[in-house]
Amino acid sequence: MLLVVSTALCVVLLDGLLWLAHPLPSGQSARWIWKHDIAGVKQEVVFEKYHDLRGLSWTANSSLQKPPGTFRILIVGASTTESSQQEPKDAWWGLLEKRLQQQPELAGKAVQILAFGQGGFEVSDINTWLKHELHELNPDLLITLVGVNDVAFPEHSDSDLPGIYRLRGFLRKVSQIYRHASAIKLKWEVARGLAVKWITARDLKDLAGKLRALPLSEPASRNPDPLPRFVAGLHSIISLARNNGVPVLLLGQPVLWKDQVTPDEDSVRWFRHYEGSEASRASGAWMYHEMQRFNDAQRKAAAETGSCFLNLDEVIPKSLEVYYDDCHYTDAGSVEVAEAVFPAMFECLHRK
């Protein structure tokens, strides 16, 4: 018992000394260079990202608290928002920010887009993240790009996220020891190339090969059906945004999948789908119609709640010039997405 009390007192004293002598801000960031070989994107990426479970990316550094006179948009999603194979300025949201900064009606304001995405995240994961970050970030508009992981990987478990987020959120507010440990961990991850889940052309080829080895399954209905959980997550995000006075633009997920997939297009596919815990392979046509079902659910949720909606899958070309796999964008693809989102975003802001 004495050892426990002594250790606790030492921790408190050390934390107090760090607050006085060497305080670190909450939410560390890092910048590093990565080289890769994926077709359609630049071969050298300068990447910058917040650490400490915030996972935010940006084109120019900024405090988490919105500066006065700033027009801030928060974009949330999974890997197609994280855009880890691109520099922030080449990602679709970076291009969108550049367009916004050139608009006369926003003259005199600093325009900023913060993007949060993490590979594999589903709507429920994003909802959990927003519950802990939306109020502090205080955006003028929330844009979501979700759905493909809910279609393909609904067995992902996020049951531990709320507890982890609450604990880390508390520690980063009160503990300098935690902040210093986070900074050291981030530097170590950057040095070892672990700060982002990078992927190479060989990785993509291996993933595509693993898909071909799976049994073919194209059920008329899925059991369990992941759609109700997806819809519940959407409504939770919209309600959370409304409670914080933030309008929402839902983006339907664009994908390479379509009714007639060419052999070259089929060769880059690696997304599987799950029935229970069993992974299966399906044609591009089956995956396309499943994605349509989820995008239609987003359209319905937007109509029911008075939110804005744009189905990107109806306007983005389905070709290897735009995608380097099932759903991730080349540099040319990011241009297509930014050009499509720009007018829809302005229309949404004018509605609100």
Predicted regions and their residues:
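Histidine-centered active-site loop/cap adjacent to the catalytic His
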Residues: L2, F230, K300, T305-C308, ...
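Hydrophobic membrane-insertion alpha-helices, especially the h-region
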Residues: L2-L17
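Membrane/wall-proximal cationic-aromatic binding patches
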Residues: H22-L106, K318-L320
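Conserved SGNH/GDSL esterase-like catalytic core that processes O-acyl groups on lipids
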Residues: P68, R72-I75, T80-T200
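Second-shell loop/turn segments in exported
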Residues: S79-E87, A115-F116, A220-L227, G284-Y288, ...
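Extracytoplasmic/secreted envelope proteins and their assembly/folding machinery
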Residues: W93, E97, N127-K131, L227, ...
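Serine-dependent acyl-ester chemistry module
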Residues: N149-R299, T305, P317-L320
